[in-house]
């Protein structure tokens, strides 16, 4: 096994249009087959569409959507004496952002609108209003954690 330890975190380059690291992370999550310019077109189009629809700052809308999607708790499997328990644990800030972006893009892809730009825009707008599949996923995750609160003492 290598003994160098974990790879250092590289600084995230902020996007040139909005100057937000969150937008850069979203672009990287939308990215497919290394087509960065296509991913940028999709994300920027979705944010501009969100600005046109609700008239607010698109980055603020995205941040509000992310706050509504980010999970505070999740369950992790823990084996104790032959039984597997779903143990509720707090989610670290970096992981909660990563999960929120993953859910946002995943539920955008599953939507029925014609273009990915429209799907992403509508999912962001829905999430900022507390609706949509990504917000439902967060609520389901929190419900699972609440239901398994009895096993919280197995936390590590």
Curated annotation (Swiss-Prot):
Query: Which Gene3D superfamilies is this protein grouped with?
Result: Ribosomal protein S7 domain
CDD domains noted in UniProt: uS7_Bacteria (cd14869)
Q: Give a GO cellular-component term.
A: small ribosomal subunit
The record's Pfam families line, in alphabetical order, gives: Ribosomal_S7 (PF00177)
Its domain of life reads: Bacteria
The alphabetized UniProt keywords are: Ribonucleoprotein, Ribosomal protein, RNA-binding, rRNA-binding, tRNA-binding
Single GO term (MF): tRNA binding
What is one GO biological process annotated to this record? Answer: translation
Binding partners and assembly: Part of the 30S ribosomal subunit. Contacts proteins S9 and S11.
The free-text function statement in the UniProt record for this protein reads: One of the primary rRNA binding proteins, it binds directly to 16S rRNA where it nucleates assembly of the head domain of the 30S subunit. Is located at the subunit interface close to the decoding center, probably blocks exit of the E-site tRNA.
This protein is called Small ribosomal subunit protein uS7
Naturally occurring in which organism (per UniProt): Micrococcus luteus (strain ATCC 4698 / DSM 20030 / JCM 1464 / CCM 169 / CCUG 5858 / IAM 1056 / NBRC 3333 / NCIMB 9278 / NCTC 2665 / VKM Ac-2230)
| Gene that this sequence comes from | rpsG
């Amino acid at each position: 096994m290598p003994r160098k330890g974990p790879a250092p975190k590289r600084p995230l380059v902020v996007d040139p249009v909005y100057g937000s690291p969150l937008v850069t992370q979203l672009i990287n999550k939308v990215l497919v087959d290394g087509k960065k310019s296509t991913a940028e077109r999709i994300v920027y189009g979705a944010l501009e569409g969100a600005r046109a629809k609700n008239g607010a700052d698109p980055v603020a809308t995205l941040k509000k959507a992310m706050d509504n999607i980010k999970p505070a708790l999740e369950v992790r499997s823990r084996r104790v004496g032959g039984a597997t328990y779903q143990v509720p644990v707090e989610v670290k800030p970096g992981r909660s952002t990563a999960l929120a972006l993953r859910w946002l893009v995943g539920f955008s892809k599953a939507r029925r609108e014609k273009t990915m730009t429209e799907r992403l825009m509508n999912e962001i707008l829905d999430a900022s209003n507390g609706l949509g599949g990504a917000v439902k996923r967060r609520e389901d995750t929190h419900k699972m954690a609440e239901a398994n609160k009895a096993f919280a003492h197995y936390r590590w």
